[in-house]
């Protein structure tokens, strides 16, 4: 890496000649050996510390450091200085000149001691992974050798992140449980989630793995090439990987396949109407095989990270015949499932999101049959999820005003608008927002019930304590932007050099800093239900006013931060997953067991009502609607349908959710017998063959 930082501490100026002590002084090293003191070695060491802190010294600052160190050494009035004392002098000089480098120097100075502890922790974790496995990520199969190696590396990477990136205050906040830094094992290396611009990469051809790929000329080749792009690019990040509007991406390649097939049948002398019918059938077959290939590839071929990337595709707005065919066929393939004959089950990836436009998919509208195919698929497989483009709220406002679709990244993250000319704000009425090709750099979540408990225990104002942790997360995000900006485009060529990301036509040696201006950073929120319970003993079903007030306060602070820092911060309704159990343990350790707060084994996800609440789907939609526009950086509304494959009821509730502007998830209790293939909503034992081998 040939950065300005490196050039700075490789310059030829010898400060040892300019700044000398008043006598010969030796530095006594840890092994007892002695070396003549030379302040040039101090400059070399602190230069490296500055490089690790993403800064550099001016000539004047270096001279200040040299003068300080030489003066202190002279004051000692000894001929030999032990290395620990020399370290203290240098550290003190750095505190005077540039405190951020003092921390970097201090952290690195103690690395040997810390590495012993870190490697011991990694060893213990590796033994657990090797012989027991790991359940932290549902997208990894810890039985595989490649995954075990990845998990062990991740543990080391997590330790390095805590040691060399987080401040003492941040580490303490994480250990206590007031904040949670997501994906510590990967944040030093790369990005979080994205809306990858596959179409931009494909157009005109691209380079991958030092081999040139021509743009596909048929649909079947397009499926293969897109599959390779997705797996390669998704391996270079750690969050959800979304291919937005996949129906529109595939449409031109379907047209090419159709024209080729039609020409073939015409050469054979087939009647025009028969040739058209057969050509369409061929394209349909290519769609079926292509989507089936994706389902096998994305669910069985692990990435180089050792996991199965969280791949999402969005579709539904294409009005052309091949775009409609793409969406309907994708839904049919998902509904039928994969596996042995009579034992087929729906797969997980790619997650499908249906882009719902009332003017296209509503009753009697041109794409109503596409909507019907989606409902039928949801009733069988719980997917697609449904994103409203024409209801209320932020996503719909972008679509209605600009015709721009804000597809979700991964399971629920959404990008804030970034305008072509104005950036964070539109330059004028004609400025357009851009979403495709952008990404998120990471999320840090607040544990709100713990923050309230801390404020009460310490007799402090709740919002004062909350603002402290918001500021902590803010500073962490600022350093993350700066740190990632120093990375080179060669770390993810498809994204940074071949056009997968907005502005991604850099040279391999270029820094990626220019691409970060449109990237978001997330402030996550969890356990709003438990926050309300702790506040006044009432759940979100019974009250919720305080939870709304808190979320409004967070929104206000984040808006201020955005304007002051020029960064696209977003508020994210955290999908707590394993975190929901960890947070209960952290709360109990500090504040004990409190009814409705920490008496269960898990807290609620984001602003969701607790899963134990006895409420109807409509009540749940109405209750969670209060928080919808306060969590625009990430959210989803789930409803569990207690009805036996009643597609009309599901359709009614989806329509209602779309009117409300929701991103709606369909939850059903579905069970499959792995022995005979029987399926029904809920079963502990298969009623057909008596098997307990159920999925």
Where are these regions (language model features)?
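Contiguous, well-ordered alpha-helical segments that form the cores/surfaces of helical PPI scaffolds
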Residues: 521-534, 552
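Structural motif
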Residues: 37, 81, 515-520, 694
